[in-house]
Structures are given as structure tokens and as C-alpha cells.
Swiss-Prot record:
Intracellular or extracellular location(s): Cytoplasm
Taxonomic path: Bacteria, Pseudomonadati, Thermodesulfobacteriota, Desulfovibrionia, Desulfovibrionales
Organism listed in the record: Lawsonia intracellularis (strain PHE/MN1-00)
UniProt-recorded name of the protein: Elongation factor G
Family annotation (Gene3D superfamilies): 3.30.230.10, 3.30.70.240, Elongation Factor G (Translational Gtpase), domain 3, P-loop containing nucleotide triphosphate hydrolases, Translation factors
Gene Ontology cellular component list: cytoplasm
Start and end residues of each tr-type G domain: 8-283
Amino acids binding GTP: 17-24, 81-85, 135-138
UniProt xrefs under PANTHER family: RIBOSOME-RELEASING FACTOR 2, MITOCHONDRIAL, TRANSLATION ELONGATION FACTOR G-RELATED
GO biological process, one term: ribosome disassembly
Entry keyword Kinase: no
Amino acid sequence: MSRTVPIEKQRNIGIMAHIDAGKTTTTERILYYTGVSHKIGETHDGASTMDWMEQEQERGITITSAATTCFWDGYRINIIDTPGHVDFTIEVERSLRVLDGAVAVFDAVAGVEPQSETVWRQANRYGVPRVCFVNKMDRIGANFFRCVDMIQERLRAKPVCLQLPIGAEDNFEGIIDLIHGVSLKFDKETKGLEVERGPIPPELMELYQEKRLEMMEAAAEEDEVLLAKYLEGTELTAEEIIACIRKATIEQRLVPVLCGSAFRNIGVQPLLDAVVQYLPSPLDIPQMVGHNPNSPEEEIVCHCSDKEPLAGLVFKLASDPFIGHLSFFRIYSGFVESGMTVLNTTTEKRERIGRLLKMHANKREDIKWAGAGDIVALVGLKQASTGDTLCDEKRPVILESLDIPEPVIEVAIEPKTKTDRDALSTGLNKLAKEDPSFRVKGNEETGQTLIAGMGELHLEIIVDRLLREFNVNANVGKPQVAYRETITKPGKSDTKYAKQSGGRGQYGHCVIEIEPNPGNGYTFINSISGGVIPKEYIPAIDKGIQDALKSGILAGFPVVDIKVNLVFGSYHEVDSSEQAFYVAGSMAIKDAMHKSNPILLEPIMDVEVVTPDDYLGDVMGDLNGRRGKVQSMEARSGAQAIRAQVPLSEMFGYATELRSRTQGRATFSMQFDHYERVPAAIAEEVIKSRS
């Protein structure tokens, strides 16, 4: 099938920012001006096109990254609207992985906010070129130049202003185009559809000349031929400036900065112009390199062409109430069409594509064919998960998957009624398949189901979705820490189990010695000699001991790191049995532990906190208050990375606490490191709570 839009006229972009910077409103205006939406949806009315889940419309925030397609000036633009809340980092992560460029939206009052820094770092990691849009210029306290300075200082970027605001706050009425030397004013009556071009206001002429000079210098520095021309005093043409800034933007040496107010319909069309002028097409970015699954050392370059064999990445799964499973798919080479069979190299299974959809938020359009560089939704895949590679069977290739962050918070969840139990299990498994940063696991010791995610809001939304989509009522509690028990000194037990109650009795007798076995788990040594216990009964003693160790004598937690030596015993020719020796073994280990000074152990987490220097003292003090032991510190571009070991029991609620202490500017990750003795006072409380 032939293309309607050539690849060089395609843009795959994300709209990213801190929560409340106005990303979704900006996207709404883009859809309005490109003719997709005939009525503007407002986020604060809960009528936004892109925020299509009920929870999003209620909370006025974007949770899942909705994908939509629009056209501007002969270009096709695929837009992914991403959430700005730190709990939904995975949505941003998986969007950036498949995008070619991004629009970073900033609040003109707040400037560079914490999540802006996080998202910017993610975009750096994936090498995504950006343009910046300083939004909300009509707000009280809006300051365009302060925002530009923050982009330079906090994000370590090299911003180049392509526009200047005309007025600010209530008096914000338009923008100056520094490249073409004109003012642009947006007609209120037509909701900004009509744009009036005019001369530069006299009071801004001096500032315009100064900033235009800065812009031309920044552009010329990126190109030797232009620099020579500029230094000779020759005026650079608009085409030369645009070409130069485009090249530097794609190579991530410059970041063009524009301004406006999406809510007031000011500056959105020039932003669209900037998207097609400065952000890359799929042909302008480095070609995707994968590996041969049958020979991992062999690299395979997936050239962006419809004529190449198919290779692409499933970057998101979603459930549609009318269609079922949707798999969002970025095509890096080749093409897909409905009815086609593809190879999933991650699962090593073949899959048939049912339908192909172009998405517009939660509306959809059936298409028959999609080519290299496109983003589409596939229907009918049964095996695919987020991060899977789909390709042509004749050229198997595996692409780099997504970087899935480890969950940082977990809570216990249980169905309110027995009838909810099966539905809870189904719902949790479905949600975990859609969202790889959400995990479900059973705790065998407590019998609880634990759900883990990126933060409290993340898990709140999950519980909310269980109720709305799966009709499951669930109670959510505080999880229990998985403590362990062990011994600190050797002990001995001589235990006889004898039972006579008419007929055949029960008889088992064993003598065991136990000692601490740090770091080596459970070890069983059989030192019986001379047949005092027949060898067929030895495994029963071992099994009885191991089963008894599943529930320790202090608080019923599993016992670890213990060495057991079976040294002596006796048996009865008639009454002895495997069952009798099983019971004798379990009784002996309990008795021996009482004599071996048992203690509680708790999980210690390896925690890394990255915080701006301003909050270092506060963060350190808080970690010390949580019984944390700081292991190391290192400077990281305007921030400090603290490595500490902290008991898991002290880490509940830490995500929220850290966010409030640092205005959300610090991030942390943690993973299990080892078990350590619980201080006596705390152990006493834990034991008391279990009795």
C-alpha cells in the first residue's frame, strides 16, 4: 500500500511536564487548531479529550498516556500526552522510549518544577530532542526570562529564545517572532484561530533587537559557514536560521524556547510550526539497532523504510470496553497490515494481528496498513506484553526493552467478601499486565496479597480501577514486614515422642545439637552411627525439623541460618514410624531453640536518595531518624546521591514524606540487601503485636 504522508513529513512527539503545567490543555488546543476536535475540552471542567479515563476526568490529571494523530501544514503529528505526576513515571518512560521528539511545557510562574527535572533526565537518557513551551504567561507572577534561566541552570540545557512575550499576566496579549521580526496577536472572537501579524511594538524594539542578536549568535555558533557569514556582518535569512536551529535541536545542542497561554488560545499555532520545523522525523534520528535472538552478539540495524522487514516495539497495553486488548505499537522498519502474522521474539511465539487502529484519545479509526515510523494500536494479540518486540519471521530481531522502575511502596489488599475473591485476582492480574510498574505478589507467611507500585496515588488509582472496571470491593491495609528468626548460640535437645493409646503406639527419639549458621541458610548433618536410628527414618526427622522452622518460637516467623546435627536417638521395633520421628524432630528443634537465645531479624534495604543540595541536611536527618546508616555520598550535577541502609519497617510512607520535605525534587529507589538483628525494644513490640 502507498503512503498518504511521506516519512520525512511525520513527527512522533510527546508532551511532557510537571503536573499542572498545562500539558493536557496545550494538547487540546493543538487538536482544536489542527481540526481534529471541533469543540475545545477544558481540563478543569472534566471534559478534556485526552483525559479519557473516569479517574482522570475526576482528578483533572493525566494518568495513562493517550495517543492521538493530527495534521498540520501537510505534516502528520502523532502525539502522546504523558502524565506529570511522579507516581506515573512508567507512562512517561514508555512514551519517551518510542518518540522522536518532545514538547516540554513549563508553567511561567513556577518555572522548572521537580517532575520537569525527572522527565528531562528521562528524555536525556533516551536522547529525545525537545522544544520548550513556557505556558500560562497570563498568570499572576508569570516571568518568561526567569523560566528560561531555570531551563539553563536546573536542566543544564542551552535554551535559545525564538519568541518574546508581549506583556505578561493580565496584560499578556501576544508574542514577538524573533526569526521573522513580526508581532503575532490572536483573535479572541475566533478563539485564536485568526492570527494578526503586525510590527514590533516600539516599547519592545530594544529588547527585540538584543534578543534577536542573541538568537542569531546561538544559531551561527552551530554552523561554521553561517558563523563566517554572521561575523562578516551579513544578515542571516529566516531559512538559514531555521535550518541551523533544526540541526542543533535534533543533535540536542540547543533547545528552542517559545511562549504563550494555551488556555487563552495564544501561541499554539507557532508551537505547531516549531514542532514541524525543529523536531525530527523518523528519518532524522539514529536508526534503531536490535540483536539477533539466535546470536546475541550480531547487531541488526532496522532502517526506517517500508521496504525493510518489519520490526517494532509494543510500548503499552490497554483494555478497551468495546474492543478488548489494545497493544500500542511503534514501527521502526517495514509495515503492518490487518490479518498479518508476526513473530514475538520476546515470547518466541507467532501472533496474528486482527485489526489496526489509529487512535484519537479514546476514539478510534480502523486502518488497513501502517508503515515505518508510525504509531498504531493493534487488536488481537494474546501473548504480547509491554516491551515485547514484534517482527518479520524471516528476520528475527530483538529490540532493547523498556527500563521498568522497581516499585517503592507496597500495601496489603484483600477482598471485602468471598464473592470478590476471584474477581480481585482477575482484576489484579489484568492491571499488572497493562502496567509493568505495578506488581502483585502473595505473602505465604501472612496469607496476604501484596500490591506494589510507584507511590500512594498509583495504588489508590489501582484500587479505584478495581472497583470501577472489575466491580471488586477491596480493603487495603498496611503491609506487614517479613521478619525472620534465628539463633545466636549453640543448643541441644534430647526429645522423646512416645504415645500409647490401645493398639500400635508411636515412638520416636532423637538428640540434636544446633548452632548459628550465618548466611548459609539451613544445614542438616546426620551423625548417627551404629544404626541407633534406622536410616529410613532420618529423612522424616529432617522434614519435621524443616517444617517446624517455618514458624519460629518468638513470633511465628520463619527461622533462617541454622545448622542442625543429629547425633543420637533410639527406636522401637513395633511402635516407631516415619510419622513418629517427624513429630520427634519438630519437637526437638523447638526445644533446642529455646536454649539458643533466639532473636528477630528484619529486612534491611539498600536505599539511594538523589536530592538537590538545598535539602541535603533535612534528608540526612530524616534517614538517621529512620535508623538508617549512610554508606556513601556523591555529587551529581547540582544534587547529592546518598546511599544508605535502612530497615524496611521504617520505609513505609517514605515516598510521600520525601516528596513533601523536598517539594518533590528528590527521588529515591530501594532494594532488599540483607537481614539484620532487630533492636531489643522494637523486637519486643513486634513479638507483643503477634501474640
